Amino acid sequence: CVNNGDMDTDLGRCSGILATANTGTTLEDCTNNGDQVNKNTNGRLGNIVCNVSHYCTLKNCVNNGDIDATATGYKGTAGGIFALAGAATIVIEGGANYGTIKTLSTAGKYVGLLWANHNNTIPTSGLVASGRIIVDGVEREINASNYMEHIGYMKNPACVTDVTWV
């Protein structure tokens, strides 16, 4: 599946491929090339998928699009590939983000190049982290020595392996 369309919206859950991956969904070799401008102030934004549920697999999905979540008072989440993955039964293998994530500091810690909130013991490997993060109009300094600090919130970082920066 491929999305080449840009999104200009005011939705709480919006992505280039699928809003919510419910139980048992597999997204494989999906590519998002569309940029998302979202005016919602409390969204879960991911340019491949917003929310990932039990027994789902994300495999070799690539995001090339940007997310602009700079609506006044924004306090939602934003990640290049997904916003929230919360079940230990999810598998994430391969994939990459090359897009820019723009948001406000009111979003807090749930902003990342790859995801916003990786909230369990989810086996995750083989990803490429790239792109940029801009918060309150200021670009974060991301490089080969600190990129793991910017891939997104991780409840259990030991589950995340083989992530490279380009």
Model regions and ranges:
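Surface-exposed loop/turn motifs in large extracellular/passenger domains
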Residues: 1-166
